[in-house]
Amino acid sequence: AGVAAALSLGMAFSASAQCVNKSGEGTNSTADGAKFQAWEAVLQATDWGSWASWMAGPQKIGTAPGYKVSKVRVTCKAGGLGQSCRAFATLCK
């Protein structure tokens, strides 16, 4: 099993009071694991309730229960525990 860690980054608000731009970083022994951790960090930085619902559901990267998600981007590179990924998205309530 891979070891994983996540870090949430930034807290910029967009022009609409109901939207936020978020980013998160994750590291894991695999790219898929690091992407998962990065998206978890985005959700945790946005809304712990949405994160909990996401964890109980299909756990699809780019989705957030209770939010419309757009501008999703994930970039990965070698680093950290094997792979390091950053996820970026705009989430609107």
Regions found by a protein language model. Give the residues of each.
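C-terminal edge-of-domain segments
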Residues: K68-K93
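Extended aliphatic helical segments
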Residues: V3, V20, V42, V69-V74
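Bacterial N-terminal signal peptides
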Residues: G2-G10
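Sec/Tat signal peptide C-region and signal peptidase I cleavage site
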Residues: G10-A17
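Short, well-ordered alpha-helical segments
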Residues: N21-I61
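C-terminal alpha-helical interaction appendages
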Residues: A17-K22, K77
